[in-house]
Amino acid sequence: MIKITTKLGCLLAGLLVLSACSSVPQPNNEYAKALDDTKQVCAACALVGNDLLVALNKSCDTPMTPETLTSVMNSNPMFAAMMAINSIGGTDFYQVYRDAAIDTLRCNEMDSWPDRTKERFQQPDMQKALALRVSARQQKAN
């Protein structure tokens, strides 16, 4: 009888822990919701904010949370530059510029990140990448 009671108690305790854990929102779910909410208000903001935060997460271990997404959009100097590029330059230009931004990311030097990115973007290999993207898109259209 004691064995059955102990096993039943352990099973109930385990189920209680699992149900408690499943009811706590996971950071990924919270982030996805924040990103979706941002998309509804400003799709370009969500695109640029997410692209920058993904790069910061990979290179600088910046957590992917609603708070860091908001912080990137409000205070990261690259956000305004990337928003301008996205709205003026179109998809091809934006994607190559984003790649240049990723290449020049230095975790402790955020203030000079836009200048480094601009210099990197002007390099011949980046200009060639842009030309190839534009050419490929034009060929698809024809």
Predicted regions and their residues:
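Bacterial N-terminal signal peptides that target proteins for export
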Residues: M1-L11
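C-terminal motif of bacterial Sec signal peptides marking the signal peptidase cleavage site
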Residues: V17-A20
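Bacterial signal peptide processing site
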Residues: S22-V24
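Short N-proximal segments of mature Sec-exported proteins
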Residues: N29-I88, L105
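Compact alpha-helical subdomains of small soluble proteins
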Residues: E67-N142
